[in-house]
């Protein structure tokens, strides 16, 4: 039992020993902490002293760094400023050599470097650089001038004085353009000079102010006009005809070939311009390049117009053809380029005005010709003005497209009032749509044709009443001949489908002519009328018994019947004789013969049936039996 207390004491002693050890360590730690705190205090004091000393040194160091950087920048700037001056001699050698020897790319790069150096020097504004800047300006101007000369030489080398346009037209070949190599070189030169020009001249500059653009127009413009000059002259020369009175036929003038060549040349030139210049340059430069050729076109059209006005009867159709050709040219060029429409309209205007005036002037001229006639054929023969007028209308059908356009601009019936001269016209060119011949276009033209025919017939009718001395019959023959010729020339030509709805205009004149011619026939027929007394028995129907009828007549009545036969014979023979002397168209002779036969034969046959026994077959009073007079009627056809 003694073991328990001993163990407990032993444990207590160990615990006290451990506590003593811990206390000893804690005391050492406390002493160490105090030492560290003392060191920290001393270190803080030392650091403060260091900061007080190092602060000013750090500020000075930073200032020195900034100063050093500034010095480096100044040295770099000076180096850059010295570089152009140092390289000027090298660039000057390239500039003096020119783009041909130095190579275009190398030459352009040299000028660009000089320009950049000049900009840098101008930005520095150092007085020491003024002389160098002046030398750079001189070199740049010299370089630009040589580039312009290079452009000029390249373009002239590729531009012949002229080409033969018919070679390309007849072989259906495209007109030549500049070679791709030259286009590339010309484009490089233009790109640099135009950019430089606009930078120096400011925003107010226009494309045509560019020296390169002026050079291009000055070289290519004469090339265009020289190439087209012969065709322009040919257009004027082909107006001369062996027979001055011959009517103009479509396509016989050179204006169509001239316009075709102009279109091909202009479009090829526009392609050149688009390949070399920037978009804003295309339109103005194209206008400037074509200016000389357009002036020649305007002069040519004025000469053609003067010729047309002097030969309006025969050559008005040329005005219609020119109107259509030039309108097509304008439309094609506008579609491809958007240019020259107003210039072409101004050039075409004199011819188009003449074309408008011609429609009314032709009617007036026909009236004047009829009024000036002093005589007409006394046999009723047709006169040339009828066929000439219809031939004019036939020819107009060949130019129906431009004529329809012109008539639209005048308005239906506008040719009567010379609407073309009322000041409404402007420098406008008709579009291709206006040349589309629809129902309205054909209707207006047919209206013009009917006006022409009506005016012609009215004029001939009035003149015939004054001039023809052979009475109503010859006037009827004259009018009927005219009607038949008009009808025939309509029926046998392209006028037929256009005027099929207006042929009634001729029916009234045919009816009038027939009425005038058959007036004499009616007078002849009066001798075949007898008087039936109502107090006597009505004649039996059917075949009359001439002997029985005559038995019922008094001697006086028989003498009257004999007189009627004799009067009929005389007037009938005279009418037949006159009929055979008249100069009639075949259709007219048949028409009038038929009218005479239908009017007289039934009356004569009736009269003969009733009274032929009046001279008892001796033929003294009754000259014709029914078969004999029928034979006479047949000779009238």
What are these regions (language model features)?
Residues 1-637:
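Long alpha-helical rod scaffolds of large eukaryotic non-enzymatic complex subunits
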């Amino acid at each position: 039992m003694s073991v328990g207390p001993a163990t407990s004491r032993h444990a207590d002693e160990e615990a006290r020993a451990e506590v003593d050890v811990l206390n000893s360590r804690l005391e050492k730690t406390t002493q160490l902490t105090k030492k560290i705190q003392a060191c920290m205090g001393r270190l803080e004091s030392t650091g403060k002293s260091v900061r007080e000393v190092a602060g000013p040194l750090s500020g000075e160091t930073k200032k020195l760094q900034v100063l050093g950087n500034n010095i480096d920048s100044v040295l770099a700037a000076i180096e850059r400023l010295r570089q152009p001056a140092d390289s000027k001699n090298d660039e000057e050698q390239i500039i003096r050599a020119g783009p041909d020897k130095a190579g275009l790319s190398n030459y352009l790069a040299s000028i660009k470097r000089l320009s950049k150096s000049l900009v840098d020097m101008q930005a520095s504004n150092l007085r020491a650089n003024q002389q160098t800047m002046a030398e750079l300006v001189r070199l740049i101007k010299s370089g630009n001038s040589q580039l312009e000369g290079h452009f000029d030489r390249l373009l002239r080398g590729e531009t012949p004085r002229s080409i033969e346009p018919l070679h390309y037209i007849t072989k259906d070949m495209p007109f030549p353009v500049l070679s791709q190599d030259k286009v590339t070189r010309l484009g490089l030169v233009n790109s640099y000079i135009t950019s430089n020009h606009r930078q120096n001249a400011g925003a107010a500059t226009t494309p045509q102010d560019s020296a390169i653009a002026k050079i291009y127009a000055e070289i290519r413009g004469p090339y265009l006009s020289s190439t087209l000059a012969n065709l322009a002259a040919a257009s004027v020369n082909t107006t001369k005809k062996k027979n001055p009175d011959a009517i103009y036929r479509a396509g016989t003038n050179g204006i169509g070939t001239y316009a075709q060549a102009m279109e091909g040349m202009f479009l090829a030139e526009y392609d050149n311009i688009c390949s070399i210049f920037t978009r804003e340059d295309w339109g103005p430069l194209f206008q400037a390049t074509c200016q000389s050729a357009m002036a020649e076109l305007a002069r040519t059209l004025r000469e053609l117009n003067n010729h047309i006005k002097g030969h309006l009867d025969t050559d008005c159709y040329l005005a219609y053809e020119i109107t259509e050709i030039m309108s097509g040219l304008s439309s094609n060029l506008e579609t491809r380029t958007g240019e020259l429409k107003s210039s072409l309209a101004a050039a075409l205007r004199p011819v188009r005005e003449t074309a408008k005036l011609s429609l009314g002037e032709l009617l007036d001229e026909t009236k004047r010709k009829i009024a000036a006639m002093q005589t007409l054929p006394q046999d009723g023969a047709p006169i040339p003005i009828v066929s000439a007028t219809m031939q004019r209308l036939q020819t107009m059908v060949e130019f129906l497209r431009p004529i329809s356009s012109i008539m639209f601009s005048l308005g239906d019936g506008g040719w009567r009032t010379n609407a073309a001269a009322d000041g409404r016209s402007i420098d406008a060119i008709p579009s291709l749509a206006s040349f589309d011949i629809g129902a309205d276009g054909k209707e207006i033209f047919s209206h013009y044709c009917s006006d022409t025919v009506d005016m012609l017939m009215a004029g001939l009718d009035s003149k015939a009443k004054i001039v023809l001395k052979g009475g109503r019959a010859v006037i009827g023959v004259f009018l009927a001949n005219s009607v038949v010729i008009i009808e025939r020339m309509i029926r046998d030509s392209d006028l037929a489908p256009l005027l099929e709805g207006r042929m009634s205009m001729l029916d009234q004149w045919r009816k009038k002519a027939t009425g005038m011619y058959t007036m004499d026939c009616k007078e002849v027929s009066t001798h075949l009328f007898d008087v039936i007394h109502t107090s006597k028995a009505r004649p039996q129907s059917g075949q009359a018994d001439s002997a029985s009828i005559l038995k019922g007549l008094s001697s006086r009545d028989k003498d009257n019947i004999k007189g009627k036969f004799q009067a009929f014979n005389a007037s009938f023979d005279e009418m037949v004789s006159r009929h055979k002397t008249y100069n009639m168209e075949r259709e007219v002779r048949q028409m009038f013969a038929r009218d005479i036969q239908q009017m007289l034969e039934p009356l004569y046959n009736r009269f003969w049936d009733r009274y032929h026994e009046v001279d008892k077959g001796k033929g003294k009073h009754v000259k014709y039996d029914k078969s004999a007079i029928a034979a006479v009627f047949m000779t009238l056809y």
